Amino acid sequence: MARQPYRFPQARIPERGSGVFRLTVRNAMAHRDSEMKEECLREDLKFYFMSPCEKYRARRQIPWKLGLQILKIVMVTTQLVRFGLSNQLVVAFKEDNTVAFKHLFLKGYSGTDEDDYSCSVYTQEDAYESIFFAINQYHQLKDITLGTLGYGENEDNRIGLKVCKQHYKKGTMFPSNETLNIDNDVELDCVQLDLQDLSKKPPDWKNSSFFRLEFYRLLQVEISFHLKGIDLQTIHSRELPDCYVFQNTIIFDNKAHSGKIKIYFDSDAKIEECKDLNIFGSTQKNAQYVLVFDAFVIVICLASLILCTRSIVLALRLRKRFLNFFLEKYKRPVCDTDQWEFINGWYVLVIISDLMTIIGSILKMEIKAKNLTNYDLCSIFLGTSTLLVWVGVIRYLGYFQAYNVLILTMQASLPKVLRFCACAGMIYLGYTFCGWIVLGPYHDKFENLNTVAECLFSLVNGDDMFATFAQIQQKSILVWLFSRLYLYSFISLFIYMILSLFIALITDSYDTIKKFQQNGFPETDLQEFLKECSSKEEYQKESSAFLSCICCRRRKRSDDHLIPIS
């Protein structure tokens, strides 16, 4: 009898009204819904990582943010240049007046400072003459000055100058017998000389006991006075003039008691609002135009700040969608590298620059309105913001492969460079402290830590090598030999070894980036997920209009339809 072939039982087709049929349809719909959700997420991710030009070609979306950034660069740079020219006039006026004051009030001033002090005296007669010369010049100021200067009130609201002297309380000294008896308590005596006192004839103030100085006890004599001036050169730039208060101080320093009294001159200029300005012409109108321009810059920066903040918020929402989807489908979290891809550092840079530009523009408007006089703080904000704005241009250059190498090389080499600099910095600090303590008494460039650090840094760049070797004093043969060993070892170590290794780190990162560009970068989970997009484009084209409608309707029920715009 022939053996019949085995027949597999046929699957039972569920009837339309049965529960199995409804479950099958529900599973199919859930699968279809999951696929649509995945495709929508993949499409949003792909659009987010596009360049502005690619976004325009993909959806005809005008890159408003790119245009706004270009306009902001032009406006901020123009604002900085105008403020820089105005600030240059302020600095020049202060420096010129300081030089004029030194020639007016310092007897025998040659035009160049001897060191950190202006000049010096070596005899008692020269000391008395220098003190009396400064006082007499102050009295005759209006007759001898070439500038727009006048007398100002001091802290006591009195017009005049104040003379103070510091000296030890009491003591006797006999150097020939090597005998010293002194009380190291310091006394401070001051006298106020008004214009009326200085105008008396004969000038009896010179014969007062206050000016009988015992130089072996004297520590210093300080002459302080206030002057007022008006900067008229701003009118040529169609700006309102500034009124200045110069707080001048002349110090005769005898603390070393070395037979040399160093004379220091310090002038602290403060800008004050002029009480009564009557200027005819277009200067006032020009100031109003500048204020309107600054207000327009603030509006542009506010718009840029809002757009970048919005993009970061939407990027974080998109990141949350991707993390939840990845965890739900693949049952594992996304790596940290992929998570940081959603945090656009350029947006953070733009936000910081916008905030600094807004603050700097407000300060600049207050300065123009003569309600604020702090040019330095405004310069820091405007200068730093302009620096960040121009650095942000690199982001758009990075879309081109030829320019992107610089950005990728900096990103790849930065961690290694920072670790290397930390190690090299320890050696650098060691040389700094050693040079300061050993060579400080014998070399001008090693007198303090700040100067030593600057000197060593210039040696690394190859500057002033011969001058550094030649200026060492040869009073001590031991120190002279140590200086040669110190300088030769530092130059050899940092130029031929540390600096070469520093360059090698950057070169290695550059070579690695070039290989990756030729052979492809290692793909992360995010890149592999986006790579599937190209393989499913045909499916997206053949998808029904009903599914597209469902996808759009589902996205409208939440904030997922908001896609970050670059």
UniProtKB/Swiss-Prot annotation:
The chain crosses the membrane at residues 66-86, 289-309, 347-367, 377-397, 420-440, 481-502. Channel activity is reduced by low extracellular/lumenal pH level. Disulfide bonds join 164-190, 243-274. It catalyses: Ca(2+)(in) = Ca(2+)(out); Fe(2+)(in) = Fe(2+)(out). Residues 449-469 dip into the membrane without crossing it. GO terms for cellular component: late endosome membrane; lysosome; membrane; plasma membrane; recycling endosome membrane. Residues 87-288, 368-376, 441-448, 470-480 are extracellular. Forms homooligomeric complexes; probably tetrameric. Can heterooligomerize with MCOLN1; heteromeric assemblies have different channel properties as compared to the respective homooligomers and may be tissue-specific. Interacts with TMEM176A. The most N-terminal extracellular/lumenal domain (referred to as I-II linker or polycystin-mucolipin domain) contributes to a structure with a four-fold rotational symmetry in a tetrameric assembly; the structure contains a central highly electronegative pore with a 14 A diameter. The pore is critical for Ca(2+) and pH regulation. The protruding structure formed by the I-II linkers may contain all the interaction sites with lipids and proteins in the endolysosomal lumen. This is Mucolipin-2. It comes from Homo sapiens (Human).
